[in-house]
Amino acid sequence: MLWHVIKNLKLTIKETYYSLVKEFGTNDPLKIIKELGIIVQFANLGENKGLYHTLKIDNITYHCIHINNNLSSKEQRYTLAHELGHYILHKGSNLHFLRRVTNTPLSRQEIEADLFASYFIVSDEEIKEINNLTYISESYKLNYRICEKRLEYIFN
């Protein structure tokens, strides 16, 4: 698995999250996305949770995020933050990111986007206070390994 690869990115991802929140005065991923001029569309995406891609028309590049409107509001918030993570962390990589409902192995970019999104969902203080990874993972609908990494980063 690629968990060791993101170890050196932990501060960058965390610092990126905090700098965005400071710059935009909110931790609402939808508000940040709109302020960045990213096009957001909610639609029935079937088994897909969300999608980030770019579209080039007449030498103008548009950044687009599509979110499945069948997701709960919590899942939509997480998916918005996840796709924002792709925009922030992987901009210019010429990759299209499609988030499916299935639990397939994650690429480095998916792990990074999940880690980034987790900061929008649960704070370091809450993780320290609760200190129960299974509870955090289930309550906040986060990947257990992401919760492990967050806890590891807090105490290391």
What are these regions (language model features)?
Residues M1-N156:
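Active-site hotspot residues in diverse enzymes, especially metal/ion-binding acidic/histidine motifs
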